Amino acid sequence: MKEIKKTMTKQMTARRDDTPLHTAVREGKTDLLLEMIGEHDGVELKELLAEQNQSGETALYVAAEYGYTDMVKILMKHSDSVLAGTKAKNGFDAFHIAAKNGNLQVLDVLIEANPELSFTFDSSKTTALHTAASQGHGEIVCFLLDKGVDLAAIARSNGKTALHSAARNGHTVIVKKLIEKKAGMVTRVDKKGQTALHMAVKGQNTEIVDVLMEADGSLINSADNKGNTPLHIAVRKNRAEIVQTVLKYCEVSRVAVNKSGETALDIAEKTGLHEIVPLLQKIGMQNARSIKPAEKVEPSGSSRKLKETVSEIGHEVHTQLEQTGRTRREIQGIAKRVNKMHTEGLNNAINSTTLVAILIATVAFAAIFNVPGQYTDDPKDVPPGYSLGEARAAPRPEFLIFVVFDSFALFISLAVVVVQTSVVVIERRAKKQMMAIINKLMWMACIMISVAFVSLSFVVVGEKEKPLAVGVTAIGALIMVSTLGTMCYWVIANRIEGSKSSPASMMSDPELADSKHNRKLYAV
């Protein structure tokens, strides 16, 4: 039996396209998880944690779904807000799936690590609070509401709030908690124009009807976009007990006609609801054709409409403020990441320049002691006019040019190495200024070492093959002039672009609009 179960697990894992990390989390192997995390760091670790299976689930999502609190704690230590908010293909992230499954401890860990996770929602704009309310997880709803976050006011894309869903699914405790937290929610309508009472009468929980009526008695005659009152809806759904509960309130209208020209009695008679018809007739409910035109009333009054409008405006303003705050935080986060990328780029450039400077210094130093023809190092064989240790090519003008330019290349490179290893610059602008100067010095060093190489090539090829050395000089000159010409063009273009964009940057967000942040070239 164990072997069969093991085989089934492997097959399911293969179908999910789980990574080893997913599998370790799914099987609850905390030690293996720690071992895998310990084998990676930095970018590699982030990539490991960000990997998704076929369903778009990250390892954090799986841990939250299964309710592995310890694993969630471990993973959150190495996860940023972007990774923690990664959504699976079902539109849920780790926080949302934990709320759906009623994992309170997991939610506590997630919201403590990143409070903004409570604002996450799926493709239909369903928040974790909404999902928890629909599922009847009272502890989760209380937990989210007690965090002081006004999630209760956020509606789904169809306009339904958490109160609508809780009322429809008959979760009395949750309805009470939501009303206690935000009493004005009872008048909120969805895109169909229906209140929470309209949703409650579709179910079978009479207690919720009483709770909502206690909160706001005017709901009894509120009409949706089709003119249906809660009584119309209850009759259409054949909810006899709900109809009895609604009829006990004296405020209920007996002459309410919907946009189809029907009273609740018309609907009951048309659909053959013999149990409900007597209940309606008992309170004096009439058919629409029996009601005099003067007696017909629109179920929703202007005062209720005004209240709903004010409530909706307040909700929209609050939502916009929350969205603005979140957007601002996201922009600041992006700016920080961009700044980090710029800093890393500068550091990489500094390290690369140091290596190149060391290389040029090494080559220049070695070249002076390895000239063609070597030196007069034999005391018994010193040519006339030479001294012991003198280079055999020393009298030639090409050698003189080589020595001068090779020395320049050596000492310029050494100067760059000394500056790079001695000066510690923290501020980014100062780093860029230093890199700009060092880059110019490296240009000079490259030119010097190139001239030294070309001059020495004349010595190497000899007089007979002098055209070959001339060809090498032409090729080198062409390449160096083209390269330096292009670099100079970039310098000028970059500075012109910076001068043009500076006035605009003063009028925008300093976090992102700094023209220097948007340049593609640095320290040229």
UniProtKB/Swiss-Prot annotation:
Keywords: ANK repeat, Membrane, Phosphoprotein, Repeat, Transmembrane, Transmembrane helix. InterPro entries: Ankyrin_rpt, Ankyrin_rpt-contain_sf, PGG_dom. The modification Phosphoserine is found at S508. The chain crosses the membrane at residues 349-369, 399-419, 441-461, 472-492. Gene3D superfamilies: Ankyrin repeat-containing domain (1.25.40.20). It comes from the Eukaryota. ANK repeats lie at residues 16-45, 55-84, 90-119, 124-153, 158-187, 192-222, 226-255, 260-289. GO terms for cellular component: endoplasmic reticulum; plasma membrane. Its main location: membrane. It is a multi-pass membrane protein. This is Ankyrin repeat-containing protein At5g02620. It comes from Arabidopsis thaliana.
